[in-house]
């Protein structure tokens, strides 16, 4: 079953809140609502997704739906997702959303107090600081077939790095722990290089 952000059928919602609902709690209803609004159907929006993937050179990618649920013909590679994330980070709105630990919507016709979403990455990350840097943002994913996945980015010693991992198994947050390990080792190597310990 797909994760939901909490919006209900017939609810009037701003597009920006749907975007936060996609990125922070992985709300499938937000993905489908945006696709329907933009293209008239999820299938037509998926065609646009595949067109964009081809333009970006994502040759190891084929999308079948907007939610990321398993389908034998729905696939990508870590490299392709990194290409997509690098491209998306050029958009200021996307960057603001993916860097947000939470987002509160205004009141709607169904939720008079609005809804607050929490980033599935940030809520499981007790500290964003890594050696010589900081994790800036990320998007988690999970299916039984793909395991725990994370597309993230961090700034280390003034340089922005993108890391995409998949297939993490086990309970808890193995994908987030993987990212912490890589970013900390990268930061330590950068420090050692700057201090002349590595030549």
Give short role names for the model-derived ranges.
Residues 1-32, 113-135:
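Conserved catalytic neighborhood of penicillin-recognizing serine enzymes
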Residues 41-199:
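Penicillin-recognizing serine hydrolase domain
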Residues 14, 33-36, 65-69:
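Short coil/turn segments at secondary-structure junctions
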Residues 11, 23-26, 38, 67, ...:
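Structured beta->alpha junctions
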Residues 18, 22-39, 45, 49, ...:
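Alpha-helical scaffold elements that line and support the substrate/ligand-binding pocket
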């Amino acid at each position: 079953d797909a994760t939901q952000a909490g919006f209900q059928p017939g609810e009037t919602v701003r597009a920006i809140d749907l975007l936060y609902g996609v990125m922070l709690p992985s709300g499938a209803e937000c993905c489908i609502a945006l696709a329907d609004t933009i293209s008239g159907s999820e299938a037509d929006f998926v065609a646009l997704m595949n067109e964009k993937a081809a333009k970006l050179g994502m040759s190891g990618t084929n999308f079948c739906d907007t939610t990321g649920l398993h389908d034998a013909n729905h696939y990508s590679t870590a490299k392709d997702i990194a290409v997509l994330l690098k491209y998306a980070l050029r958009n200021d709105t996307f960057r603001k959303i993916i860097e947000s630990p939470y987002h509160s919507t205004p009141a709607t016709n169904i939720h008079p107090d609005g809804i607050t979403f929490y980033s599935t990455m940030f809520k499981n990350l007790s500290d964003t600081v890594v050696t010589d840097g900081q994790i800036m943002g990320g998007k988690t994913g999970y299916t039984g077939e793909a395991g725990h996945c994370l597309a993230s980015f961090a700034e280390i010693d003034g340089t922005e790095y993108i890391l995409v991992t998949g297939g993490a198994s086990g309970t808890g947050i193995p994908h987030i722990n993987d990212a912490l390990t890589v970013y900390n080792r990268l930061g330590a190597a950068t420090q050692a290089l700057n201090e002349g310990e590595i030549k």
